């Protein structure tokens, strides 16, 4: 499904100055952590700008293969200029395979309130794989038209515990193959997220 949303680089900065929307800062890391004190030096007003930080070491721990991270709409994060998407620059464009090039789309999905298709089943689960790690029914991504995935990296012929084929090309899955789509229900959820108090001023 097509949500008809366009993301554009800012043309006007916080003080009204002309900008390309791209700023370069050397040797920064760790903005993938919830609180990153140095981020305050660079953050633009989260009510007016969607901040995307591109770096190689997302968590400041020397690990450079984490692909990306973002957070669901949260007015407290927006008020504190903590709302953001953080993306590993090593995976931009032709630097990597097609699957990792779509990580930014995946993280934008989280920014607009989409969960993974496998919810929190990213590790071991109890007997009865339709249960999550807490032993509760797995809600998938809370979107009715997205088949639940019992775990990440389910493929084209894999079925979930309800017998449904998984939506393996969904952007909110993890996959070693090309992800390429959102369901209509996911699009509706993202459009609803645009009216959240943490996001609405970005487009109004």
Feature roles, as predicted:
Residues 16-19, 60-64, 95, 179-182, ...:
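Short, solvent-exposed loop/turn elements at domain surfaces
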């Amino acid at each position: 499904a097509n949500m008809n949303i366009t993301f554009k680089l800012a043309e006007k900065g916080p003080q009204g100055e002309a900008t390309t929307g791209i700023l370069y800062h050397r040797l920064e890391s760790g903005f993938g952590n919830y609180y990153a004190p140095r981020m305050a030096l660079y953050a633009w007003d989260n009510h007016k700008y969607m901040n995307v930080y591109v770096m190689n070491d997302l968590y400041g721990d020397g690990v450079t293969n984490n692909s990306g991270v973002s957070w669901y709409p949260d007015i407290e994060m927006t008020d504190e200029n903590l709302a953001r998407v953080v993306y590993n620059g090593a995976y931009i464009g032709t630097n990597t395979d097609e699957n990792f090039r779509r990580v930014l789309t995946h993280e934008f999905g989280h920014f607009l309130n989409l969960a993974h298709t496998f919810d929190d089943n990213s590790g071991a689960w109890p007997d009865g794989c339709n249960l999550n790690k807490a032993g509760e029914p797995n809600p998938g991504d809370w979107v009715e038209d997205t088949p639940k995935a019992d775990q990440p990296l389910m493929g084209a012929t894999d079925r979930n515990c309800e017998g449904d084929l998984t939506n393996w090309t969904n952007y909110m899955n993890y996959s070693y193959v090309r992800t390429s789509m959102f369901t209509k229900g996911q699009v509706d959820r993202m459009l609803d997220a645009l009216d959240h108090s943490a996001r609405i001023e970005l487009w109004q």
